[in-house]
Amino acid sequence: MKESILVTGANGHLGANTIRSLLEKGYSVRAFVRKNADLRGLIDLPVEIIYGDIRDKSTVIRAAKGCRVIIHHAAVYKLWGKTVEAIMEPAIEGAKNVFQAASNAGIERVVYTSSTFAIGGTADPKKILTEKDWNEKRHIPYGYAKTKSEQLAWELSEKYKVGMIALLPGAIYGRYDYRITPSNRMILDMIKGKGMTIKNKISFIDSRDAGALHALAVEKGKIGERYILAGEAMTMKALGELVQELSGIKVSHMPLGRSMNIMMARIMETIAKLTKEEPPITVGIVREYSHRYAQY
């Protein structure tokens, strides 16, 4: 058995895939999850479950003792919420606690899960973005949290002299996805006949590939590098057409300008506040994605 690796956010979609890849490589895994977390993605896996809160420094420090590497997945994955702080705080405090724990435990590297949200998109449909690009927009709290927490993580890496590798997955789809997230909700809304697409292009990655690449980064990742984990870039319209082809359900497309899309999104947000249900499109999503191209 190889060394122990601590995986935060272990019960999530990406965590379940990462852990399987680590186990295949012979690593011992500590799965850091919140109390009462949904553990369906970890059923029957030979892992040590550690309960705690990423915002609680003491529990993260205890979990990291004896580990060689930390893979930090834990984050609040929501594109719409009552407050920005509910999404920002766990991201920022989580980064602080992970690096403090790594320093205390003498851990040599942290594999830090960021997101292509931290790179963003461009109005130029021909431009290819790279790992040198940063997204400083505040349109979507989750995206802004990813940018700021990753930037903080690089600072903490220097402060604590702990090596860091940042992995930036695109939209993740695939196996061991048991909960409703912004990624799969978009598809579910389409299947239910209430989803709609806007003019843009985004990049995707299979969950198995994303997990395998996190496991590979433990051994092969170069300290100090950002790696984009994204495959084919696809227009939302093409995605909707694919869903329609597979499900037989018509998916609406909004070939409107940004200003009209924003107006539609405002209406949906107003309805959402009354129904207490997350809207399929928000003003932030439109500003971030409408007529924007995320190609890497």
Spans of features found by a protein language model:
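NAD(P)H-binding glycine-rich loop region in Rossmannoid oxidoreductase-like domains
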Residues: N36-E93, A101
